[in-house]
Amino acid sequence: MAEVPPGPSSLLPPPAPPAPAAVEPRCPFPAGAALACCSEDEEDDEEHEGGGSRSPAGGESATVAAKGHPCLRCPQPPQEQQQLNGLISPELRHLRAAASLKSKVLSVAEVAATTATPDGGPRATATKGAGVHSGERPPHSLSSNARTAVPSPVEAAAASDPAAARNGLAEGTEQEEEEEDEQVRLLSSSLTADCSLRSPSGREVEPGEDRTIRYVRYESELQMPDIMRLITKDLSEPYSIYTYRYFIHNWPQLCFLAMVGEECVGAIVCKLDMHKKMFRRGYIAMLAVDSKYRRNGIGTNLVKKAIYAMVEGDCDEVVLETEITNKSALKLYENLGFVRDKRLFRYYLNGVDALRLKLWLR
C-alpha cells in the first residue's frame, strides 16, 4: 500500500501550548478602565469585520506586544459581567437583540390598548413578567450590570408596582374596577329605595302593591264611612253624621281625600260662605291623617288643595280652630302662613282651650 505523502499542514510546527492561567497576572484595571480585555475570539471577529485589511508592518508587532504585555492579557470574566466599557461579547449579542425586540413589542401593545379604550383614557395592558414572579429572573435575561437599554414605560410600571406585575394588571384597571363597583353600589341603593317593602312611615308593604299617594275630591256617599272613621279617631269630640253631611253635601268641592291604593289615609272638610255680609270667609272644619302615614306631607298637601279651591271661589280669608296643646297642628298651619288671631277658653267639650288661626288672602 502506497504511503500518502504528508500534506502542507503537517509541515507547520505544532502550536505552542497556551500558558496556564495561574501564571499570567490578572488585569489590574477595573471593568470601566480605558483598556478593554478582549478574548482571542473577539480579536478574530474584529479581523473579519474589518475586511482582513490589517497593516503588515504594525499588525503583527501590535499582536506580539499585546500578547507580551502583562496587563493586556486577562482571564475571561464570569457570565454576569460580559459587558465592559459598552462592548458586548458575541455570546450576548443575540440576547441583546431579543431584549430590544421584546421591549418594542410591549410598547406597541401598550399603544394599541390605549387607543382601543372607548373613553380615550389610558388602559393598562399585561405588564412585562406577568407570568413570572417578581423574585424570579426570566430566562435569557441580562444582569443589572450588563443591562444598558432604557426600560420601556410598561417595564418601569411593573418594576415600581410589584403587585401590578404579579397580577398582570396596572393601576388604571384597578381604578376602573373601583368606579364600576361604585356605580353598582349607587344603582343597588337606588333600586333598594324604590323597591323597598316598607312604606315611608315604616309599615310593611305587600310586594306589587301601589304605595303612591293620590289626592282626590269627594265623589259619592260611599266615601263617607272612611271620612268618619279618620276624623272620629283623631278629633277631640265626636260629630254626628248630619254634621258631616252638612259640610260635604253643601261644599263637596272643598272636601279632599288622600288615597293610598284603595285605602283612605287622610281627609279635609271645609266650607265657604259670606261673613257678616261683607267678605267671603273660608273655614276648615275637619282635618285628619292616619297615624301610620303622618310626617309625609299629607296634611300640608290637603290644606293647600283646600285653600286653592277656596281661592277659585273668590275667598277673602281662611279661619280655623285647633287645640292649644296640639303643637304639630299649630306648626303645620303656621308654616302655611296662618297667624294666631284669638284664644278661645274651654272651647272643646273636654275643657281644652282653642286657638283661632287666620290666613288673609287679600
Swiss-Prot record:
Chain ranges of the N-acetyltransferase domain: 214-362
UniProt feature, compositional bias: Pro residues: 1-20
Recorded GO CC terms: cytoplasm; cytosol; NatC complex; nucleus
Chain positions with N6-acetyllysine modification: 233
Chain residue ranges for the region called Disordered: 1-26, 38-88, 113-182
Listed GO MF terms: protein N-terminal-methionine acetyltransferase activity; protein-N-terminal amino-acid acetyltransferase activity
Keyword Repeat: no
Origin superkingdom: Eukaryota
Modified residues annotated as Phosphothreonine in this record: 117
Composition skew (Acidic residues), residue ranges: 39-48, 173-182
Entry EC no(s): 2.3.1.256
Top-tier EC class: transferase
Modified residues (Phosphoserine): 39, 55, 152, 190, 196, 199
Similarity field: Belongs to the acetyltransferase family. MAK3 subfamily.
Function: Catalytic subunit of the N-terminal acetyltransferase C (NatC) complex. Catalyzes acetylation of the N-terminal methionine residues of peptides beginning with Met-Leu-Ala and Met-Leu-Gly. N-terminal acetylation protects proteins from ubiquitination and degradation by the N-end rule pathway. Necessary for the lysosomal localization and function of ARL8B sugeesting that ARL8B is a NatC substrate.
Protein name listed in UniProt: N-alpha-acetyltransferase 30
Natural source organism: Homo sapiens
